Structure formats: C-alpha cells, structure tokens
C-alpha cells in the first residue's frame, strides 16, 4: 500500500458493550480486489494495475477505527476502479471469535454481539503476504468477451429466480435449469452439480451483463448427502468440454443441489412445510468453494433445493447467489427461452464447417 502497511484488529463486545475479545486478523482481500477489478473493467476496460486496500476511517470515532475499506485498481492514465467495502466484510472473523467464545463459555449461544475493526499503520514492515496487505501490480486475463446489446436478451425473459437485488443482470436459459433439475432427480439422496459457462458482455449504455450458455455436469466428484467435492479430474473434464466447444466460453459460475427432502425427517406434512432444511441457504462449505474457484466478481451460483407444498409434496426450488462488494449475497437471475444463445451457437457451428470439394 502506498505510504505503508496496515494491520487490522478485531474487537468483539457483548450487548452491554463489554469487551470480550480482541485479536489481530488477516483479512482475505481477494474478493474485495475482484470487486475493484470489476469496477475498473466496466469503467476503463482494463483490470491490470496497481491494487490497493486502504482503511476508511470511522466518521464519528475516527482513527484507528474504520467503517470499512476502499479497494482500488489504478490502471494509470486510463483511470481507476474503486469500491467501498462495508464492515460486513469482516463478519466471518467476528463469527469465528463468537464460536470460540461460546465454546469456552464466555458467551451464551444466540446472545447479541457487537464488533469493531481498527487499522494500524506499520510503515517499516515489508509486504510479505499476497492479497493480505499492501499494493500489488498483477497481470490478469480479462474476462470481458466484448460489446453486445443487452436488449437481445431482455426481450426473451420468461421468469426470474432468486431473491434480492442484482448489481448486474445474469441471463440463464430455462433448458439449463431443466438439465440441472434432471441431474438432481437422478442423483437420489446425494448432492450433485456442475459448472455453468458463458460470457461476460458489456452493453455500451446499460453496462455489464452475464449470459450463461451451457451447463457441464460435474463428473469424478465425491458426492455425499450434505457435501459435493470436486476433484482435479472434475476440473480437467470441464476444461476439456470447454475446449471442445471452441466458443470462447469461460467459467461464469456453478450449480449444485441440496437434497432437502432427504435431510428432512419431519413425520407430519404440516411440519415438513415449515422444515428448516427447506429454507434457501448457501453453506459455509458452499462459500468456501465459491471463494476458491469462482471468486470473480461476475461469477455466480445457483442452488437447487426442495420445499414441501401441502397437498402437492416436494417441489424443486431455485436460489441464486453472487458477489456484491466482495461479499456473497442472495441475488436474482433472469430466465430466458435460450433462443438467442442457441442461435449464436448454431451460427458459429455453421460458420466453422468446412465443405470438401
């Protein structure tokens, strides 16, 4: 970081503002910097430059207390991409402390807590941890495919899935969700899933949007009732499928299932309707995989779960997730009839054919 290096300290208080624990933390800055890269991509068309994380000092408490941080990618004379990261970015660190306090008996489970974060300048300490502290200058592959009109896809919207807002539109053909649901039904009592590939486009007027073009079922996985593990063979298989398509597609996210009807042991239909397992959720294991593989600010996740409807039995549900300010949140997706995606692929296939004379 220009001017020095910052260390961050987390303090956790009970509802009576009594300090329970204070500790140094090492935030994972990659999602925050990905959010800044996405801003740079949308505003100046580049993601390569000097990357910084700087504290945003608390407006009333002042230094060393912060209200968040500012992630920035400076691409030189072309400009920069910057985004303000809120305090909720540090919530996982607070949750980890709370878990330890509950286990030690210092805090009652369910008790409300407060937390604060402070930043301290350490000017003479060298930067040693990539994406933890300081400034970085890296070369990255640009995920933007090019310019395209979003109107082509908006006119084919048939429905929406997921809840919450959306910092950019995502279009998914219904046929892809049908494929995923068929995979879910065939998996029985274990989780299953796959990778969704497609393109990140930029509409000159409306901004960026993602188009999902295909679903690649994940093979060579370790599937359990409450966990799906992708192996090196899984990723090799997916990459081979992408290369065979030769459509310039890239990972835009993943789909996996929560077989809630298997998890639910409620004896009566009325209790099944309100079963906690049937609620939409993105587990800590899900979040870990998303962070490790799908950390790009434009990359998304879809979860197929189950909900019990009185008189109708179990029904598949869809929930959507994605990045917003470096944090995984619930979000909405548009479901299309897939006609534009299909026509584009068929046109490319036709143009790629060679006729022997």
Tell what function each PLM region has.
Residues 1-251, 259-357:
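Conserved beta-strand-loop surface patch within small alpha/beta domains used
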